[in-house]
Amino acid sequence: EVYLPYLNNTEKFTLFYGGAGSGKSVFVCQKLILKLLKYPKRTLLVIRKVSASLRDSIYQEFITHLTKFGLIDYCKVMGSSLTIYLPNESKIIFKGIDDPEKLKSISGIDDIMIEEATEITLDDFTQLNLRLRSKAENQQITLCFNPVSKTNWCYKHWFENGTPEDTCIVHTTWYDNKFLPQSYIDSLEQMKKTNPIYYKIYALGEFATLSKLVYNNWRKEDFNWKEVHSKGNTQALFGLDFGYINDPTAFVACLVDTTNKNLYVFDEHYEKGLLNDEIA
């Protein structure tokens, strides 16, 4: 039900992102098949970063839904070239970004679907956007992905500075999928206890950072360090890492609450080119 309002949206760019098991790829496949049936002789290009990953993933997803719709026997399926021709002469072409020469040879593209969009780069996306130059109406690029780091191009381009013009963004999680087996739901709930960061990304579909974190259970909040220290169960600690030209000098001031196992960072400094007397 959460997807139905977006069945016929007209924005040029549509992002379906969120947690694993949310059903977003299923809906997008069904949505695009219906669009291809509505517009005869239309061409849909389906993209993943690596062409070798297409056959067992999104290509098979389209085959599955064409079968469920009772259309597969009326389609011409070219397994060698990963191309599907629909009864009304619309077609679906599956390609990998890692095969740029073959991409250049494709003409008349009317719509593009990018599966696992976080795997490609902004340059890849820009080139794909330039491929939409036919005269067909309602040309669209649809992106599907599970969020990763906020350093990824998807976050920086689509979220960091607000929603861009002519863009529709849809966020869903496994809570929106009524067809999940209980065993899958149980595994996600177990992840919530054992690995909160993975749960945040893969279950809740939020942007986060997966690796190279010393502390992953932190938050920003206002506090008075003097009041915290006055409670008597904290110890003040200060850390200093010397640097100069290539690396900055880093200083951190914190309070350690050993009873409740909390660490309060209340001051820090990070700067290159400091001399010893300036540090002091």
PLM feature segments, named:
Residues 115-116:
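Walker B catalytic acidic pair
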Residues 1-11:
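Pre-Walker A adenine-sensing motif
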Residues 177-243, 247:
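ATPase catalytic-site recognition across NTP-hydrolyzing enzymes
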Residues 25-40:
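Walker A/P-loop NTP-binding motif
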Residues 253-280:
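Nucleic-acid-processing active sites and adjacent nucleic-acid-binding tracks
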